[in-house]
A protein has these predicted regions:
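A catalytic-pocket lid/entrance helix-loop region that shapes and gates access to the active site
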Residues: 116-151
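Catalytic histidine-centered segment of alpha/beta-hydrolase-like enzymes
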Residues: 260-272
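Active-site loop/oxyanion-hole signature of alpha/beta-hydrolase fold enzymes
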Residues: 54-92, 263
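Conserved loop-alpha-helix segment in the C-terminal half of the alpha/beta-hydrolase fold
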Residues: 218-263
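Alpha/beta-hydrolase fold catalytic core
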Residues: 1-23, 44-47, 137-139, 246-247, ...
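Alpha/beta-hydrolase
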Residues: 147-237
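Conserved HGGG/HGGXW glycine-rich cap/lid loop of the alpha/beta-hydrolase fold
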Residues: 16-62
Length: 285
């Protein structure tokens, strides 16, 4: 599937498909719109997917702050207006993008909202714990790579090939995602993601649980939460464990909670089998 690129007030967007039904897709905290490449490739003919690079990421990296998830939600709503979203439009987000989707859906009606391994408030940090330290502990290698430079595109690809989440799950979609993220001169290549944008958004996620709770309760559209049973490093501890998700599923009658078997936080949007489940939920009647 080939993306057609455009800009909306400096935000890079990409469109795949030509169908009348619309999906708007939002990526994670250090990612880019190319994290939706596997979804775009399998898109049914009656659908169009619009993905966007969030402020401070991808080809939207040059947009200024302030950052924070409410700012990203405003950008999503601006893109929705630009592409002609209507009451039949589906909104989805992966990881941090799921939280952005919640904030956007609290302000505008969508046909449904599909949250992919994100969207539920994290427990408050213990007293004295610095949000930046909590973010670093949670993201691990994903944050480390933003501080590094790479001698070649192949070296950056190799970094991702060695990531435990992609062991045995490498694909053309993953490689295209990785190469899209690179910028800078040969010999000193780096990720396009702006470290301060990532830190600012991470602080917001770890300190604004009340705002997320209010937004979740304000969403009128039916919501589907798709959870990966394994985490960012393919470990047994998921991003959203059962004891976090169950109370929210009970609290919000419009929320359907589902675990997608045999995937981790990354492969839930890259692995063909996992993507088939995701697409089924996105395009359900």
């Amino acid at each position: 599937m080939t993306f057609a690129f455009d800009d909306v007030d400096g935000l890079r967007i990409a469109r795949a498909g030509t169908g009348p039904r619309l999906i708007i897709a939002v990526h994670g905290i250090t990612a880019s719109l190319m994290s939706w490449g596997a979804v775009a490739r399998r898109l049914p003919g009656e659908w169009t997917l619009v993905a966007m690079d969030l402020r401070g990421r991808g080809h939207s990296a040059g947009l200024p702050g302030p950052y924070g998830l409410p700012r990203h939600a405003e950008d999503v709503l601006r893109v929705a207006e630009h592409v002609g979203a209507d009451g039949g439009t589906v909104l989805t987000g992966h990881s941090m993008g799921a939280y952005v989707a919640v904030l956007a859906a609290a302000r505008r009606d969508f046909a449904r909202v599909v949250l992919v391994d994100g969207g539920l408030p994290f427990p408050p940090l213990p007293e004295g714990v610095d949000p930046d330290a909590a973010l670093a502990a949670a993201l691990g290698p994903a944050l480390d790579r933003l501080r590094q430079t790479y001698p070649s595109a192949e070296a950056y690809v190799e970094f991702f090939r060695n990531h435990p989440a992609f062991a045995g799950h490498w694909s053309d979609d993953v490689e295209e995602y990785v190469r899209y993220d690179l910028t800078g001169p040969e010999g000193a290549l780096r990720s396009r993601a702006v470290p301060e944008a990532v830190r600012a958004d991470g602080r917001w996620l770890h300190t604004e649980q009340a705002a997320l709770t209010t937004a979740l309760e304000a969403v009128k559209a039916p919501m589907t939460l798709l959870r990966a049973p394994r985490g960012l490093l393919n470990q047994d501890v998921p991003m959203l464990p059962d004891d976090l998700a169950a109370p929210w599923a009970a609290r919000l009658p419009g929320l359907r909670d589902e675990v997608v078997p045999d995937c981790n936080h990354y492969t839930i949007v890259f692995d063909d089998r996992c993507v088939a489940t995701l697409l089924d939920r996105l395009t359900a009647p």
